[in-house]
Amino acid sequence: MIGPGTGIAPFRAFLQERQATGAQGPNWLFFGEQRADSDFYYKDELSQMVKNGLLTRLDTAFSRDQDHKIYVQQRMLENTGQVWDWLQNGAHVYVCGDAKRMAKDVDNALRKICQTAGNLSDDQTEEYMAALRRDKRYQRDVY
C-alpha cells in the first residue's frame, strides 16, 4: 500500500477491515507527507497497528523534515530487494494519491525494482508490469 498525504484514507479502511475480519497475511504501508510532527495522519492508530501485528511494516517519508526531500518512492527503492521478494510472493500493490508526480514516480520506482532486483530487461519489465495490472495486483486510485 502506497498512500502519501490524503492517499492514506483507503488504506486505513483496508487495515480496519482486516482487523474486523481477522484477516491474516503480511502487509506493508508506505506513507509520506511534508512534516512528521504536523502531517503524520493517524500516527497513533498506525503505530498501534504495527505494535499489535495488524500492520506488518510501516515505512514513512517526510519530505520537509531534513535538508533533502524524501518521498515514498525513495523508501521503496531503499527496500528494492524486499519489495521484489514481496512481489514474487504474490503481493498486491495499491497506490492512492497525487496523479501528477507521485503516481508516476512510484510507477518508475516499481519498474526500477523489477530491473534491479529481478534482473529484468526493459521488455521483460513491461511484460511484468502488464501482468501485475492484468492480474489486478497493481491498482491505482490517483487524482
Predicted segment positions?
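Active-site beta-strand/loop microenvironment that shapes enzyme catalytic pockets
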Residues: M1-E17
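Reductase modules of NAD(P)H-dependent flavoproteins
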Residues: Q19, Q24-Y143
